[in-house]
Amino acid sequence: MRTGSNFLESNLNALPGVTCHGEAFNPFFIGGEGKQELFGIELAGRNADPSGFLRAMRDQTDGLAGFRYFSDHDPRVFDLVMNDPACAKIILTRNQLESYISWKIAVESDQWWLANTKHLKTVRPTFDLPEFLQRIDDLTQFQAKLVKALQVTGQTAFTLDYDDVLDLGVLNGLAEFLGVPARLENLVFR
């Protein structure tokens, strides 16, 4: 597996009462690569009414419903979730050079999710300094916006670093933060 967010999602989904619906607001798909529909709503419907899509997600999910949100996803969703104190926030951070290299590998190999290393495509990514610096600037601005939104709404988030997702204790602390009684006995590697 290449990214911590995929690994985190797998482990959250292993907790009874928790369902992470992947990148539900990715501009190109719903939930996972190639998916164009979720909760009976197609991509165009989700894009036209993200609030309605969130309602459908809550209504059609047993237990806690969640999704992964990245800075390049639908910006309207940011305001919807940040203004909802009932929506728990989990912030996963990573060394930006490692993140950039992982992203470049995904782009250049067209492998965005890797559960089976037999299918691993080996590439040596091209490092583009202006592109890298722009990504850092964009992410810094997004993180500042995120922190400010938490501050002005009096909310807190569960923060973890990329390396923390390999710590069973930290993931069980996250379950506690979410108010879920279940705990992981082992990490899920799939």
Name every feature range the model reports, one short phrase each.
Residues 56-59, 148-153:
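Short, conserved catalytic or adaptor-binding loops enriched in Gly and charged residues
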Residues 2, 164-165, 186:
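Short, surface-exposed acidic/glycine-rich loop or hinge patches that mediate macromolecular interfaces
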Residues 61-65, 88:
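Loop/turn-to-beta-strand initiation segments
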Residues 1-60:
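PAPS-dependent sulfotransferase catalytic core
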Residues 41-48, 112-115, 183:
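A polyampholytic, Gly/Pro-enriched intrinsically disordered region
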Residues 70-148, 155-157, 165-182:
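PAPS-dependent sulfotransferase catalytic domain
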Residues 183-190:
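C-terminal accessory extensions appended to soluble enzyme cores
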